[in-house]
């Protein structure tokens, strides 16, 4: 139980989720406390701005029914810390780290600051071990790497929630003696989405190795900004203290940024691009940069954040700034979704900057780089030929061009498309890749090494294609 260091009855204003306290002395940025209104109900607060004789604090429990007159604020002289424990695995929490599953918190093994432990850049270890998600488009083309931060850029109405649940359920680390855990963070999600995730995790058994932090759209905006940090604090404890490889799935970071904008507006700050605060890049970096591996530590923290691009605009400040910080992006395509392809990846717009160092012999399979490079190059050429066919007609194309059209169809329908409950290993993904590539003549596969093509090319597939 924390003991108040100082109390103030000088609340000047309640403005949205914020309160302004006058005549303060010695109050620090990030310090926690509580505000008690005339009803006697305590609500946790955190200082987000300090002036010469005033402080601004965000009320984590919301300010509904809280008047300025008659309210008392008590500060504790400490920053916000949450109890952490290995027994949190299998639990569902809210955005403040409190139970949402109607069970008591387990005995804490430690208390950790929600702002995390800064990793010395010199101690960081380069990520080069893959995580198998069971989704061919990710594992085959843009492999997720332990310690990486790889976001999904989605749009309203696209199946990013299904993908988040599938990744939580299927992801694993092969050939590792350390444990593997998933921390799922729902930020500003609707009640029906929260019910979907909770039901899905329980039904499939994914919750047995996961911690779920669910912040609802109806929860206070201050909690929305806190939720990713709570999830990452739990992930860091599991990784750095207990040696787990932790995959952190966060959805939806757009809701986080909207909450950040709302808090900034409430503080009267000068807005930046499209009304978002000018420090949004720095703020996002404090979240994304908590991913990584460190020398001398067994565990790792991998981030898989999901955001919805407003109006499908990839130049919007949220995806734009996210792309600067993270190591690539996976873009979902509305056109692919319209054709009934799940997961609807935009292969050409997607990128994983670290994938090349986490695949190949001894990690996945010797032909992995060849398959990935050749599939992307061939599909890019096939899309150009598909556009040409709409102008001149398929019958006026040569036989090689028609093979590229067959390849593009097979690539989308057999390689990219897979069932929601279908899990593919690296080997299965690469085998499907060769089945699709073998539709093309062998001399077209110039992005693969000759010895690899000779070993894996399926001539019987080539001969069976009807033009």
From Swiss-Prot:
Region described as Disordered: 95-114
UniProt cross-references to InterPro entries, sorted A to Z: ATP-synt_VA_C, ATPase_F1/V1/A1_a/bsu_N, ATPase_F1/V1/A1_a/bsu_nucl-bd, P-loop_NTPase, V-ATPase_su_B/beta
Keywords: ATP synthesis, Cell membrane, Hydrogen ion transport, Ion transport, Membrane, Transport
Mode of membrane association: Peripheral membrane protein
A Gene Ontology BP annotation from the UniProt entry: proton motive force-driven plasma membrane ATP synthesis
Top-level division of the source organism's lineage: Archaea
GO molecular function terms noted in the UniProt entry: ATP binding; proton-transporting ATP synthase activity, rotational mechanism; proton-transporting ATPase activity, rotational mechanism
This protein's GO CC annotations: plasma membrane
Chief location category: membrane
Protein role: Component of the A-type ATP synthase that produces ATP from ADP in the presence of a proton gradient across the membrane. The B chain is a regulatory subunit.
Stated family: Belongs to the ATPase alpha/beta chains family.
HAMAP family registered for this protein in UniProt: ATP_synth_B_arch (MF_00310)
UniProt cross-references to PANTHER family, sorted A to Z: V-TYPE PROTON ATPASE SUBUNIT B
Name assigned to this protein: A-type ATP synthase subunit B
Biological source species: Pyrobaculum arsenaticum (strain DSM 13514 / JCM 11321 / PZ6)
Gene field: atpB
């Amino acid at each position: 139980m924390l003991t108040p260091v100082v109390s103030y009855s000088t609340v000047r204003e309640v403005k949205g989720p914020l309160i302004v306290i006058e005549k303060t002395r010695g109050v620090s940025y990030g310090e926690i406390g509580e505000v008690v209104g005339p009803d006697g109900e305590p609500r946790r607060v955190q200082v987000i701005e300090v002036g010469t004789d005033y402080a601004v604090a965000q009320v984590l429990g919301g300010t509904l029914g809280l008047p300025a007159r008659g309210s008392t604020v008590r500060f504790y002289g400490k920053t916000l810390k949450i109890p952490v424990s290995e027994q949190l695995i299998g639990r569902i929490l809210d955005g403040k780290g409190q139970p949402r599953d109607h069970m008591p918190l387990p005995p804490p093994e430690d208390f950790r600051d929600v702002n995390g432990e800064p990793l010395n850049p010199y101690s960081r270890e380069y990520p080069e071990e893959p995580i198998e998600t069971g989704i061919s488009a990710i594992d085959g083309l843009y492999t997720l790497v332990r310690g990486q931060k790889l976001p999904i850029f989605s749009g309203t109405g696209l199946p990013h929630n299904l993908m988040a649940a599938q990744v939580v359920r299927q992801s694993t680390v092969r050939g590792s003696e350390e444990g593997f855990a998933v921390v799922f963070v729902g930020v500003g999600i609707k009640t029906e989405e929260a019910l979907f995730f909770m039901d899905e995790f329980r039904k499939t058994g994914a919750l047995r190795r996961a911690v779920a932090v669910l912040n609802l759209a109806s929860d206070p905006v201050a909690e929305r900004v806190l939720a990713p940090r709570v999830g990452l604090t739990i992930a860091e404890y599991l990784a750095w203290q207990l040696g787990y490889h932790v995959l952190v799935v966060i959805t939806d970071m757009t809701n986080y940024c909207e909450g950040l904008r709302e808090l900034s507006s409430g503080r009267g700050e000068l807005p930046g691009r499209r009304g978002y605060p000018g420090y949004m890049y720095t703020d996002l970096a404090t979240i994304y940069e908590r991913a990584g591996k460190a020398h001398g530590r067994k565990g790792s923290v991998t981030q898989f954040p999901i955001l919805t691009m407003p109006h499908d605009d990839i130049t919007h400040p949220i995806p734009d700034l996210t792309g600067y910080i993270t190591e690539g992006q996976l873009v979902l395509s509305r056109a692919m979704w319209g054709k009934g392809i799940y997961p609807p990846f935009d292969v050409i717009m997607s990128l994983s900057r670290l994938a090349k160092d986490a695949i190949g012999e001894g990690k996945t399979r010797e032909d992995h780089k060849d398959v990935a490079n050749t599939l992307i190059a061939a599909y890019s050429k096939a899309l150009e030929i598909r556009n040409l066919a709409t102008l001149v007609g398929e019958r006026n194309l040569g036989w090689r061009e028609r093979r590229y059209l067959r390849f593009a169809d097979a690539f989308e329908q057999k390689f990219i498309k897979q069932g929601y409950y279908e899990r593919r290993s690296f080997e299965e993904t690469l085998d499907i890749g060769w089945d699709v590539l073998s539709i093309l003549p062998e001399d077209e596969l110039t992005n693969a090494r000759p010895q690899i093509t000779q070993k894996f090319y399926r001539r019987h597939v080539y001969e069976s294609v009807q033009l």
